[in-house]
Regions:
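Extracellular glycan-associated modules
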Residues: 1-153
Length: 154
């Protein structure tokens, strides 16, 4: 598999309190730090991300400390399958668990080994922040940890 990725740095900020990310993903192998999407500076791991951590889906925002951090209990072992991953962030929701929602193939994940939600009204760190690099298929700041697989229809 190629180590290709897409990158964009946005010039005008948009809403950091509400955003969604959606993509079809086919995993090439279950490796640690296989990044689907990232945004940030990568200085001292200062990044927001959606990635596969071995066979777990990990969704997080880390601009120096965790704004939110979820690691699924569901394992993703079928390397022949296409998975539709969707993350919805809305920190204005009154219930903490409604502020970050993760869906796989249209079904909301509800079981996590790590489960930290943002406070009400919290910015998501780097996503939709002016001047921050956003990458599909790798980490920011050097494009490390490329996804071992395919990403399409984002």
């Amino acid at each position: 598999m190629a180590s290709s990725y897409l990158t964009k740095t946005f010039g005008s900020p948009t809403d950091q309190n509400k955003w969604t990310f959606s993509a079809w993903v086919k995993l090439g192998q279950a490796t640690s730090d296989s990044v689907i999407f990232s945004a940030g500076t990568n200085a001292s791991n200062n990044i927001d991300g959606i990635k596969m951590d071995t066979q777990d889906l990990r969704v997080f925002s880390y601009p120096g400390s965790y704004v939110f951090h979820l690691i699924s209990n569901r394992k993703f072992r079928d390397l022949s399958a296409w998975y539709h991953f969707q993350v919805a962030y809305d920190s204005d929701q009154s219930t903490a668990a409604d502020r970050v929602k993760c869906y796989v193939n249209g079904t909301q994940l509800s079981s996590f080994s790590t489960e930290t939600y943002p406070s009400s009204g919290a910015n998501s760190g780097h996503i939709n922040l002016n001047g921050r690099e956003h990458i599909i298929g790798a980490d920011t700041g050097g494009a490390n940890n490329n996804i071992n697989g395919y990403v399409t229809h984002c």
